């Protein structure tokens, strides 16, 4: 456990020594701080100079990583050891994008051979849709693709397709359906022509309640309009491992794309779950996405900790969570194309590390994953940055931006990028009472009024942030960015001694929903309901009589 590691008390002592130091003093004394705390990898760079740390902090954090045998645990993941201990599974999302030819054997399965076989089928299918060779039941080309999934079968593909919209096939429109409330699927179907629509049903077991409910609604809509169930074969494909259930649905087994237990849902966009990405962006861009992630994998696996982006970001996060007692972490992308990135990272981070039981089954006596949240930065400035600047919470921030200007939008990117730099500087530097008072007096305010108002215009500063810069929003850079966060999450899981690759926390609510649903549908259940739940069931039934 973290608190039992030999470096932990050293970090506690060091924290007490520097907790009151203001970052602006470090910048004033060290003119090289910005260049020393800056890393470049391919087309992605990290400025971590605006963090409450110094050389001693980093030295101790790297010692902490060594205490946990982080290097050995990284290797164990890449080699296919069963590090998902509660489910006795390997964790090989990295193999999905590997350009290495050294085969990985897992329970007599040739992992890379299996992955590349599915990728080959995905490329052929994608080409047939994009080229117009694959036609609908009236011989129309496909114009709309509907991805039906939830969680990891939705968020990754949604995020990537949105981020890389500029690379999409001009004929194709992407739609994503995850919510089971009925509104989302009906709103999407309302816009579509069944004769030119392709549905991708993404569910590993082909039994996920929300996904199957939406898929059956789409199937009913399609059959009613096409007039014949046999047309399903041309318009529905599945990403699943349950061949029997897929065939019962009416989908041809040749239109089923497989993935495996060694790929967790939140790590699955690189697999057949990414079929919608490949069709929308094309195999060349999908390959570039995989390559960007692979290069980050190699960097994570081989770079020294001192220059290793995922290791640094993971350790800096631990520094705030376990020493500064930070409870929350903000993701602030300054790019419209990255608008779904915060909620993708929410799942990646919180479903992986939102746990309080160690690998040995013991209750952990320290904080683990923070609440991860965010929005597009420029909008967030006019919404909740007030709390970040002058509130009572210490909330580290990841600013994410690109250097590349948008065509035909003169002046826009300069305004956007200036705000990234200004906000990061403001969070670090702040504004003292004396500075605020001087500004007000210079504007001509009465001295007594200025003295009173100045208190409200003080920014303490010393609020930490990372600035992640991409040269441009491209397939390879998005691949690298996602892999960076995947590995950051892994690093923190190792430090906290938790299994980052199970998700038992999603199970209990699903189990309890079964008897409640029986009651709502008019059937008697033998389950026990607390008085609140029982009252609300009756309220629903009475309203809908």
Curated annotation (Swiss-Prot):
Pathway(s) annotated for this protein in UniProt: Carbohydrate biosynthesis; gluconeogenesis; Carbohydrate degradation; glycolysis; D-glyceraldehyde 3-phosphate and glycerone phosphate from D-glucose: step 2/4
Q: What EC numbers are recorded for this enzyme?
A: 5.3.1.9
Q: Which InterPro entries does its entry note?
A: G6P_Isomerase, G6P_Isomerase_C, Phosphoglucose_isomerase_CS, SIS_dom_sf, SIS_PGI_1, SIS_PGI_2
Has the keyword Isomerase been applied to this entry? yes
Sorted alphabetically, the keyword list is: Cytoplasm, Gluconeogenesis, Glycolysis, Isomerase
The active-site annotation reads: 351 (proton donor), 382, 510
Q: What does this protein do?
A: Catalyzes the reversible isomerization of glucose-6-phosphate to fructose-6-phosphate.
From the UniProt record, report the name of the gene that encodes this protein: pgi
Q: Name one GO molecular function term.
A: glucose-6-phosphate isomerase activity
Question: Which domain of life, per UniProt?
Answer: Bacteria
Q: Which reaction does it catalyse?
A: alpha-D-glucose 6-phosphate = beta-D-fructose 6-phosphate
The record ties this protein, via PANTHER family, to: GLUCOSE-6-PHOSPHATE ISOMERASE
The record's annotation in HAMAP family points to: G6P_isomerase
Q: Which organism is it from?
A: Helicobacter pylori (strain ATCC 700392 / 26695) (Campylobacter pylori)
Where does the protein end up? Cytoplasm
Question: Which SUPFAM superfamilies did the record assign?
Answer: SIS domain
What name has this protein been given in UniProt? Glucose-6-phosphate isomerase
Q: Which PROSITE patterns match?
A: P_GLUCOSE_ISOMERASE_1, P_GLUCOSE_ISOMERASE_2, P_GLUCOSE_ISOMERASE_3
* Statement: the UniProt record of this protein carries the keyword Repressor: no
Gene3D superfamilies the record matches? 1.10.1390.10, Glucose-6-phosphate isomerase like protein, domain 1
Which protein family is it in? Belongs to the GPI family.
Q: Name one GO biological process term.
A: glycolytic process
Extract one GO cellular component term from the record: cytosol
Predominant localisation class: cytoplasm
